[in-house]
Amino acid sequence: MEPLASNIQVLLQAAEFLERREREAEHGYASLCPHRSPGPIHRRKKRPPQAPGAQDSGRSVHNELEKRRRAQLKRCLERLKQQMPLGADCARYTTLSLLRRARMHIQKLEDQEQRARQLKERLRSKQQSLQRQLEQLRGLAGAAERERLRADSLDSSGLSSERSDSDQEELEVDVESLVFGGEAELLRGFVAGQEHSYSHGGGAWL
């Protein structure tokens, strides 16, 4: 952006110089030599007179250089018009007004770029803050998950212990019922045998 701004400044100075020269030429007081401050008059060496052909050649070279410079300035201005939002009436702009608008446009772009950098920096800081919060939440979630797994493990161990105690009690009850049931069966058999023997003995006595 800075090289473009410096180029615009150079073009602006050139356009101001050209317009000043054109106004001076229109009013008839254009001065080809720079203004000299009053001071002591120095003797000037007389230059030898030049031939008319040499003067014409120097003038033609100067005109050719001026023509090339104007053509280059025109090409730069055309490229500048393509890069600026001028609208439909861009043909009405003079060189000086076009360069001034270009300078204002560059300043506007620089301001936008600065605001964009500031916004980018704020967004980067916000992203870092959110990243830290996310890491903290992940740590809390991991701790909660480990606590839940530990609680589930303790619950499952408690249930296994209770189930083992219950199974042991049921086994003892089954054994006791089996023993008591066998003893009752033997007792009933013994009583039945006694009654049978008594019945046979009574018949013999009769």
Curated annotation (Swiss-Prot):
GO terms for biological process: regulation of transcription by RNA polymerase II. Residues 57-109 form the bHLH domain. GO terms for molecular function: DNA-binding transcription factor activity, RNA polymerase II-specific; DNA-binding transcription repressor activity, RNA polymerase II-specific; protein dimerization activity; RNA polymerase II cis-regulatory region sequence-specific DNA binding. Keywords: DNA-binding, Nucleus, Repressor, Transcription, Transcription regulation. Residues 8-25 are annotated as: Interaction with SIN3A and SIN3B. Residues 25-67, 146-171 are annotated as: Disordered. Its main location: nucleus. It is found in: Nucleus. Efficient DNA binding requires dimerization with another bHLH protein. Binds DNA as a heterodimer with MAX. Interacts with SIN3A AND SIN3B. Interacts with RNF17. Transcriptional repressor. Binds with MAX to form a sequence-specific DNA-binding protein complex which recognizes the core sequence 5'-CAC[GA]TG-3'. Antagonizes MYC transcriptional activity by competing for MAX and suppresses MYC dependent cell transformation. It comes from Homo sapiens (Human). This is Max dimerization protein 3. The keyword Nucleus applies. The gene is MXD3. GO terms for cellular component: chromatin; RNA polymerase II transcription regulator complex.
